[in-house]
């Protein structure tokens, strides 16, 4: 990695030139942790916060917000997104992008940031707002605890128990299973489930759940297979007819460096670069393609 002061200088030149794609390119070269160091070096060199300079130089919109997020404290960014999603009518899609698409380490820091910023404990605030009447709410509560426990049986045994839970609509078991099974153990169970039943877990989810319940369990399924798999699915959802810039800002700004494999996982839906080009305008599309490293 070049000296952070040199990278900060490159960014200053790109910002002065109002070159959004170049700012995105520089961001795409580094992890979130490295970008935070670059942002600190920028302040040391120029006496200004990097996101503030981006905001002054660019012309608003989700593009500006995304580029600012990339050089901001990502835990504070996630905390703010969650708070926004809880304000007024709950934004369920935002919960998938921020709560489920998140590593345990990042979640721990997000909880601390939320308390610091809003003087409230995140999980309590979340559950008070959404309630506990629906299964998706209870799964979210389990998910936010990040308490994974090894399953007692073999993958085949666990797959059989899971199938019984689907058949009996034992939602308490399903909530506990998806909320606590370790990711490393999930794939073998999923493979055994399909071999035994001739259908996938995602197909089984669709037999008993609809709407927000369905999407929450579906996202949990992909997250357990790998965050890049979930990112690919969420990006595909965001690539609707008009393109959902708010969702792409959340997904990309917080997780792009951890989910670059999404461009390969996306192949089951089509070509990520092509879909981004089709759904987003000539300002946003090049930024997204650059950050996700797709043509």
From Swiss-Prot:
Main location: cytoplasm
Family matches, as Pfam families: Annexin, ANXE1_4th
UniProt GO molecular function: calcium ion binding; calcium-dependent phospholipid binding; phosphatidylserine binding
Annexin repeats: 2-71, 73-143, 153-223, 226-293
Keywords for the protein's UniProt record, in alphabetical order: Annexin, Cytoplasm, Cytoskeleton, Microtubule, Repeat
Keyword Membrane: no
GO biological process: cytoskeleton organization
Gene Ontology CC annotation, any one: plasma membrane
Top-level lineage group: Eukaryota
The keyword Transcription is assigned to this record: no
Compartmental location: Cytoplasm, Cytoskeleton
Membrane-spanning ranges: none
Family of the protein in this entry: Belongs to the annexin family. Giardin subunit alpha subfamily.
Function: Giardins are involved in parasite attachment to the intestinal mucosa and in the cytoskeletal disassembly and reassembly that marks the transition from infectious trophozoite to transmissible cyst. They may interact with other cytoskeletal proteins such as microtubules in the microribbons or crossbridges, to maintain the integrity of the ventral disk.
Protein name, as recorded: Giardin subunit alpha-1
Organism: Giardia intestinalis (Giardia lamblia)
Source species taxonomy: Eukaryota, Metamonada, Diplomonadida, Hexamitidae, Giardiinae
């Amino acid at each position: 990695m070049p000296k952070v002061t040199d990278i900060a200088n490159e960014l200053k030149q790109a910002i002065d030139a109002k070159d959004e794609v170049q700012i995105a390119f520089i961001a795409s070269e580094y992890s979130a942790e490295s970008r935070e160091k670059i942002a600190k070096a920028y302040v040391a060199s120029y006496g200004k916060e990097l996101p503030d300079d981006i905001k002054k130089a660019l012309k608003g919109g989700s593009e500006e917000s995304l580029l600012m997020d990339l050089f901001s404290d990502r835990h504070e960014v996630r905390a703010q997104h969650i708070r926004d999603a809880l304000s007024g009518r709950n934004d369920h899609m935002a919960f998938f992008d921020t709560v489920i698409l998140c590593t345990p380490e990042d979640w721990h820091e997000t909880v601390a940031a939320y308390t610091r910023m809003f003087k409230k404990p995140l999980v309590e605030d979340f559950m008070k707002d959404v309630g506990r009447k629906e299964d998706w709410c209870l799964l979210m509560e389990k998910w936010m605890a990040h308490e994974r426990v090894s399953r007692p049986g073999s993958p085949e045994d666990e797959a059989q128990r899971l199938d019984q839970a689907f058949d009996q609509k034992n939602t308490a078991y399903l909530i506990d299973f998806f909320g606590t099974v370790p990711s490393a153990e999930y794939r073998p169970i999923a493979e055994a489930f399909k071999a035994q039943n001739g259908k996938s877990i995602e197909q089984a989810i669709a037999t008993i759940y609809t709407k927000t319940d369905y999407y929450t369990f579906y996202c949990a399924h992909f997250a357990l297979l790998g965050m890049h798999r979930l990112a690919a699915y969420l990006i595909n959802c965001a690539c609707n007819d008009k393109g959902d810039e708010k969702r792409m800002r959340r997904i990309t700004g917080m997780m792009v460096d951890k989910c670059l494999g999404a461009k390969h996982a996306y192949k089951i839906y089509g070509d990520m670069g092509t879909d981004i080009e089709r759904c987003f305008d000539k300002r946003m599309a090049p930024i997204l393609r650059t950050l996700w490293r797709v043509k």
